[in-house]
Amino acid sequence: MYSTTDFRKGLKIEIDGVPYDIIDFQHFKPGKGGAMVRTKLRNILNGRVIDNTFRSGEKVERPNLESRDMQFLYHEGSELIFMDLTNYEQLHMSEDVTNGKSEFLKDGQQCRVLLYNEKPIDIDIPLTLILEVIETETAIKGDTVSNVTKPAKLETGVVIQVPIFINIGERIKVDTRTKEYIGRE
């Protein structure tokens, strides 16, 4: 169990059976009564942000969260299949849970899977990835107005905007949070 004195940004707590991530907290003492702690919490399961106030010294549960190294094997419909690298068990996860991160998964790629009570709830992928362009339009000579972009399909199937000088077969660096082109590899 955690006490409100243990609170810090990024700490994971559980309230009424739901895991939360502390985004912000502030200790304050009202005119009368004991000290309190105001918090801003993000629900780990659905991403919603709530405000909650705790009495100073109040105890909260520690969630049963675990992060495991896994290898992405393949897509099966809207399911993602991972293999645990320690015991080689397969784990099925819904694409909906990943908040769009599954668009950047390649077969055989390693990542960390966050589990809550042995159920997968999120994946951690690198902030940037090197991916190959498999489909894009060819640039027309003289098309050099500043910052001209075109859509490009990458090897994982995600489509992003790239500069016009990028061609099929080139490897590019992509920001996985914003789905933006960073540069050539």
Swiss-Prot record:
Its main location: cytoplasm. InterPro entries: Elong-fact-P_C, NA-bd_OB-fold, Rib_uL2_dom2, Transl_elong_fac_P/YeiP, Transl_elong_KOW-like, Transl_elong_P/YeiP_cen, Transl_elong_P/YeiP_CS, Transl_elongation_fac_P. Keywords: Cytoplasm, Elongation factor, Protein biosynthesis. GO terms for molecular function: translation elongation factor activity. It is found in: Cytoplasm. SUPFAM superfamilies: Nucleic acid-binding proteins (SSF50249), Translation proteins SH3-like domain (SSF50104). Pathway: Protein biosynthesis; polypeptide chain elongation. One of its GO terms (biological process) is peptide biosynthetic process. One of its GO terms (cellular component) is cytoplasm. Belongs to the elongation factor P family. Involved in peptide bond synthesis. Stimulates efficient translation and peptide-bond synthesis on native or reconstituted 70S ribosomes in vitro. Probably functions indirectly by altering the affinity of the ribosome for aminoacyl-tRNA, thus increasing their reactivity as acceptors for peptidyl transferase. HAMAP family: EF_P. NCBIfam families: efp, PRK00529.1. This is Elongation factor P. The gene is efp.
